[in-house]
Amino acid sequence: MPNNYIFKNFKNNKAYKLQLLEVVKKMCNMEIGGYKFYDGSGTHYMQNPNEIVNLIFHLKNFEKKRKIKLENFLEIGFAAGINNSFLNKFFNFKKIIAVDYVSPGGINKETFFSNLRFKNLTLICADSTKKETIKNVSVLGPYDFIFIDGGHSYE
């Protein structure tokens, strides 16, 4: 029986990349290049589809070129965990550390709780800019991949 999940059958070619881009567009709202209108539910994927697909291809090529597997993932800015879960489907990280405030506003609780499951995740509920948080996160490293998508204050 063939495995029809797009993340299980990664192919480093243009046709697969276009197919993956269409999948990501369907997950995103129109404001960021997708097909869905944002309804305020916090259940949409909040990344630019082209950027996330290019990132996945870049990381897969990095693994192949270096003959390594990305195993330890640090994400700064977990939000509802959609990005975290999506990347984990492609890389099946051995260890995931995520740092973010846990704020009830703007995040769908069902999406949040569903994205805490089925992976080796440690969620640190703290301010990623504080020295104590940085120290705690450092102790849990080293990391093969760090994705920064938090603290959008630009201060």
Give the residues covered by each predicted segment.
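A short alpha-helical cap/connector motif
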Residues: M1-F147, G151-E155
